[in-house]
Amino acid sequence: MKLGVVGLPNVGKSTLFNAITKAGAQAANYPFCTIEPNEGVVAVADHRLDVLNEMYHPKSLVPAVIKFVDIAGLVRGAYKGEGLGNKFLAHIREVDAIVHVVRCFEDMNIVHVDGSVDPVRDMDTINLELIYADLEAIDRRIDKAKKNSKSGEKKYLAEIDFLERIKAHLDDMKPVRSMDMTDDEKKAAEELFLLTTKPVIYVANISEDEIGSEPEAVKKLYEQAAKEGAEAMTVCAKVEEELSELSDEEKAAFIEELGIGESGLDKLVRASYSLLGLISFLTAGTDEVRAWTITKGTKAPGAAGKIHTDFERGFIRAEVVPYETLVREGSLNACKDKGLVRSEGKDYVVQDGDIIVFRFNV
């Protein structure tokens, strides 16, 4: 699973990416300083691992991770291939969700491509490019379905009807993700690989002076996100980049001084994890304490397969204890003695925070 970090040139996108990954993606006051997407893997902050680390003192501690991709800045006409449009759209097709960084700060030293700060206009600029690209794709699919429908098969007529509904929604300049669809239709829409089916988090990038306040530009961004049914959050990318260079102790002191309670990046990573419908199950022992990423609704054999394909192929059962129960009782053996470890079969749906030992035979 990976998220694409997008935004118009000079909105602070690469600065934010630097902070989340500490990968040093070039951040300069120049459009298209990011030409090839930079990728970074980020740990998902999880206090449960810290507690289990103190309990087990394992040889290794492995957090869940999420991948971010810094995608080159976009300009109007991208869907027609202008600027780096073709590359931009190709890279967006490869990600599972979008982190859309929107400039909400004023800075005379950093030129805005449109000459002024207007978050709603900037949101629309990128969204319209994605909608136009989807319209072209849908038109091609409709033409193909109409040719196939000449065979008289009813499935093609149903497909045309569905595609026409999507086209009408896009013609209204609305993303496909905001359509009312049944679960089956949502699945069918995902199989079309349209750009506007991808979930979005809008990130309002503010200046350090605006931390703790609610600038008018941010209010407008939140209002627009609410209309789209999208998530939104506020960060100061420059401060987050500074925080990423500090030790844990220095970071905690700086966060306290800023009065923000928690870094914006921790919030972003957690929100991204949630947006993708991801949860973590845990394995714990003296060799390793680890968080494993799965999608909500994954059954026990599928979760076992995340560890090794043999675990899934030869799955017998899962021995499960909730994290809170293990911590309360102090050890897995204590949980077993009290009959608190459940034996679950192949139909068990794994829950966030389950601590699991898989039994298998191949």
Give the role of each language-model region:
Residues 40-45, 72-82, 93-156, 169-182, ...:
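Conserved Switch II/interswitch segment of TRAFAC-class P-loop GTPases
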Residues 2-6, 11, 17, 144-349, ...:
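C-terminal-of-GTPase-core extension/linker across diverse P-loop GTPases
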Residues 14, 31, 67, 71, ...:
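Generic signal for short, ordered secondary-structure residues
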Residues 32, 46-49, 62-68, 82-96, ...:
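Amphipathic alpha-helical transducer elements in NTP-driven molecular machines
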Residues 1-111, 139, 145:
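Conserved G1/Walker A P-loop phosphate-binding module
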Residues 23-31, 38-40, 48-51, 80, ...:
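Glycine-rich, flexible loop/turn motifs
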Residues 6, 32, 37-40, 47, ...:
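Short capping/connector residues at structural and topological boundaries
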